[in-house]
């Protein structure tokens, strides 16, 4: 009884303190609202103009797109209508190439080999951890919800799929890391293609054939050989920036420049200036971004097929992917950021709002890269040495949303075909989905191409990818947003873990500047002593 009586006053005291705290905060909020002036409102709107305009563009674009759907616009009319959005994509893609190269070179050059090695290891561990978690979430969600229940005969198919083997895709990934021509890597990447070739195969002789009497020699040759057709891999290329090759080269180049000390100073200054110039161009393009996003979203909604085809299994598949991406983006990534940094992840994510909306509109993590740089460095104050190193690499190889989608979609296709996967096959899917997401380019709908590798690894029919193409344009935007969020939070985590190395580097740079100035002083004094004294002209001489 005594214990319960003692607890009641404590509970009452806590409730009173809580109520007092709520009252104080309410009064403070009222005072702030009452003290607001027109200037305060204007300054707030000006500071958040980009975000407000971008959010408005998404809402207006969605409404406009659905409003224009009943007019059944032709393909040509849709292309004309989407032209402002196409211009935005072109502007952003124009800046991606110089931005990746300049940011990586300057980022690596600003770090010593020890710091860059530690930072690189932390970034890789983060990338692999989040990608594996995303794959596991995708597999668990699709097994629990089971969206593929039923048959595939009633499902809508769209498009054709190009076959590719897992071995060739993996070798292409390695080949693209080492481009033979850097100029060509700016607009082309290696891709194995297949062509049909005929081979003459000798037929083993048997007793019947040996016993036969053949008078004609040519007839004998035709009898002893047969023609076999086979699809063989041949070297090829596809249009598009070889981002992986440029990332590898830029990192190595920046590392070498950083170790060249004074000899590399001119190159460091050049790439620093280039990076600064690109970021100023980004600041200009950001004002056009809301208009471009509006027409991109509206045009895509007008262009999409009849909503009637998205029913049953496909609707459940769409819901399953959205749930998986939400769990990863809203719960896992912020929780990981909080556990490592002990900071509020939602404040950090708030500074990324425009980058996330741009990713939703453009459906390309590479095209969003300039905006992501701007948001992280200006809104969230992330060290430029971190963003220049982590973001270009992350936009190339860290694709959490793509990995989740590929694992989930592969098991969905297995369910549609009533194909029971064992534990070993699920592990195979998880490994290949992780590897395939690394090789997926940061371009729209790149996940569909790498999906072939995942399906081939467990013997699933690759033609069934056509079952999910109808909704991929929408899911691709959500995947891209998740990818950009993962890269950005990764930059924040790596900065927190590398703060001591960055401080030490700042101290070293400060000491080196002081030493240089001290070294210059004796020479300046000697030069001053050796200078002949100039006669001082008086006013009379001047006159």
Swiss-Prot record:
Major subcellular site: membrane
Protein residues bound to L-aspartate: 363-365, 402, 443-447, 476, 483
InterPro entries: DAACS, Na-dicarboxylate_symporter, Na-dicarboxylate_symporter_CS, Na:dicarbo_symporter_sf
Biased amino acid composition, Basic and acidic residues: 531-543
One Pfam family here: SDF
Catalytic activity from the UniProt record: K(+)(in) + L-glutamate(out) + 3 Na(+)(out) + H(+)(out) = K(+)(out) + L-glutamate(in) + 3 Na(+)(in) + H(+)(in); K(+)(in) + L-aspartate(out) + 3 Na(+)(out) + H(+)(out) = K(+)(out) + L-aspartate(in) + 3 Na(+)(in) + H(+)(in); D-aspartate(out) + K(+)(in) + 3 Na(+)(out) + H(+)(out) = D-aspartate(in) + K(+)(out) + 3 Na(+)(in) + H(+)(in)
Tissue and organ distribution: Detected in brain, in Bergmann glia arborising into the molecular layer of the cerebellum (at protein level). Localized in brain and is highly enriched in the Purkinje cell layer in cerebellum. Intermediate level in lung, low level in spleen, skeletal muscle and testis.
Binding-site positions, Na(+) 2: 396
Post-translational modification: Glycosylated.
Transmembrane segments: 48-68, 87-108, 123-145, 237-260, 270-297, 319-340, 386-412, 473-494
GO annotation, biological process: auditory behavior; cell morphogenesis involved in neuron differentiation; cellular response to cocaine; chloride transmembrane transport; cranial nerve development; D-aspartate import across plasma membrane; gamma-aminobutyric acid biosynthetic process; intracellular sodium ion homeostasis
Gene3D superfamilies: Sodium:dicarboxylate symporter
Record-listed Na(+) 1 binding positions: 394, 398, 483, 487
Cytoplasmic side: 1-47, 109-122, 261-269, 341-345, 377-385, 495-543
Keywords linked to the UniProt accession: Amino-acid transport, Cell membrane, Chloride, Glycoprotein, Membrane, Metal-binding, Phosphoprotein, Potassium, Sodium, Symport, Transmembrane, Transmembrane helix, Transport
Membrane topology, record value: Multi-pass membrane protein
Membrane-side (Extracellular) residue stretches: 69-86, 146-236, 298-318, 413-425, 460-472
GO terms for cellular component: cell periphery; cell projection; cell surface; neuron projection; neuronal cell body; plasma membrane; synapse
Family per record: Belongs to the dicarboxylate/amino acid:cation symporter (DAACS) (TC 2.A.23) family. SLC1A3 subfamily.
Protein name according to UniProt: Excitatory amino acid transporter 1
């Amino acid at each position: 009884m005594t214990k319960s009586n003692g607890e009641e006053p404590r509970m009452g005291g806590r409730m009173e303190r809580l109520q007092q705290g709520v009252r104080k905060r309410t009064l403070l909020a009222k005072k702030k609202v009452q003290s607001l002036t027109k200037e305060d409102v204007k300054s707030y709107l000006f500071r958040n103009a980009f975000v407000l305009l971008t959010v408005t563009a998404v809402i207006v674009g969605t409404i406009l797109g659905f409003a224009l759907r009943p007019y059944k616009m032709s393909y040509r009319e849709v292309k004309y209508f989407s032209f402002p959005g196409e211009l935005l994509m072109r502007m952003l893609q124009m800046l991606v190439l110089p931005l990746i190269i300049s940011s990586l070179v300057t980022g690596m050059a600003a770090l010593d080999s020890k710091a860059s090695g530690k930072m690189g290891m932390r970034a890789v561990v983060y990338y692999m951890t989040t990608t594996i978690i995303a794959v596991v979430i995708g597999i668990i969600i699709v097994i629990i919800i089971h969206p593929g229940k039923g048959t595939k005969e009633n499902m809508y198919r769209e498009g054709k799929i190009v076959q590719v083997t897992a071995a060739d895709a993996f070798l292409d990934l390695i080949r693209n890391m080492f481009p033979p021509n850097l100029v060509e890597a700016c607009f082309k990447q290696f891709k194995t293609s297949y062509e049909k070739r005929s081979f003459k195969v000798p037929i083993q002789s048997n007793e019947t054939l040996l016993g036969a009497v053949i008078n004609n020699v040519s007839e004998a040759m035709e009898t002893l050989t047969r023609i076999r057709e086979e699809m063989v891999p041949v070297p090829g290329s596809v249009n598009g920036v070889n981002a992986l090759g440029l990332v590898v080269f830029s990192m190595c180049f920046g590392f070498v420049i950083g170790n060249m000390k004074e000899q590399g100073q001119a190159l460091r200054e050049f790439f620093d200036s280039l990076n600064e110039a690109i970021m100023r161009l980004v600041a200009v393009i950001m004002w056009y971004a809301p208009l471009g996003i509006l027409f991109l979203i509206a045009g895509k909604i007008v262009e999409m097929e009849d909503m009637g085809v998205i029913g049953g299994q496909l609707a459940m598949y769409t819901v399953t992917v959205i749930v998986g991406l939400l769990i990863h983006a809203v719960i896992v990534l912020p929780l990981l950021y909080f556990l490592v940094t002990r900071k509020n992840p939602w404040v950090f994510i708030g500074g990324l709002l425009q980058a996330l909306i741009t990713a939703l509109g453009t459906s390309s993590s590479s095209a969003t890269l300039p905006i992501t740089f701007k948001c992280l460095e200006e809104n969230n104050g992330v060290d430029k040495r971190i963003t220049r190193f982590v973001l270009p690499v992350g936009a190339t190889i860290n694709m959490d949303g793509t990995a989740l989608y590929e694992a989930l979609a592969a098991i969905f296709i297995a369910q549609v075909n009533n194909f029971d996967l064992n534990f070993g096959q699920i592990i195979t899917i998880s490994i290949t989905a992780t590897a395939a997401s690394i090789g997926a380019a940061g371009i729209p709908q790149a996940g569909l191409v790498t999906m072939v590798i995942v399906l081939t690894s467990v013997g699933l029919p690759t033609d069934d990818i056509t079952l999910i193409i109808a909704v991929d344009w929408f899911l691709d935007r959500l995947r891209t947003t998740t990818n950009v969020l993962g890269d950005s939070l990764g930059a924040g985590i790596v900065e927190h873990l590398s703060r001591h190395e960055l401080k030490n580097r700042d101290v070293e740079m400060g000491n080196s500047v002081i030493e240089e100035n001290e070294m210059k002083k004796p020479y300046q004094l000697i030069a001053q002593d050796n200078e002949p004294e100039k006669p001082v002209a008086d006013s009379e001489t001047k006159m």
